[in-house]
Amino acid sequence: MFQGSSALTLDAKGRISIPTRHRDALMDRAEGRLTLTRHPDGCLLVYPRPEWEEKRAQIAAFPMSARALQRLLLGNAQDVDIDGSGRVLIAPELRNASGMTRDVMLLGMGAHFELWDAASLARREAEDLAQGMPDVLNQFSF
């Protein structure tokens, strides 16, 4: 399971270096094979390929009323591999769609990651905190 955040930098070719603490697990779990796609919140989702295969089947089975979401998730999905230096290429289409510039944040979200433009994530977190805690946390103790 993946957790925690990592501040990363896109290189001139649009690649990020996967943090070592995640790289080994991704190599063991998915042989370094990942799938990236867009998320409605404006970030990119990064899945180890085996987990993505399960999600892809679930998304493909959505009813016609969810066609726009299918188009966003499946139509933008791109398979990538971690290279020998531990880097992953983020396609220009995905970088542009998510507003990624140079500084990005990789967030471990359990079985997958979210990849955000750093400034966009900071704005989003500030907006989310300003709205207060969701009701689901009323029964949760930290």
Curated annotation (Swiss-Prot):
One of its GO terms (cellular component) is nucleoid. The keyword Repeat applies. It holds the Pfam family MraZ. GO terms for biological process: negative regulation of DNA-templated transcription initiation. GO terms for molecular function: DNA-binding transcription factor activity; transcription cis-regulatory region binding. It is found in: Cytoplasm, Nucleoid. Its main location: cytoplasm. InterPro entries: MraZ, MraZ_C, MraZ_dom, MraZ_N, MraZ_sf, SpoVT-AbrB_dom, SpoVT-AbrB_sf. Keywords: Cytoplasm, DNA-binding, Repeat, Transcription, Transcription regulation. Residues 5-51, 77-120 form the SpoVT-AbrB domain. HAMAP family: MraZ. Forms oligomers. Belongs to the MraZ family. This is Transcriptional regulator MraZ. The gene is mraZ.
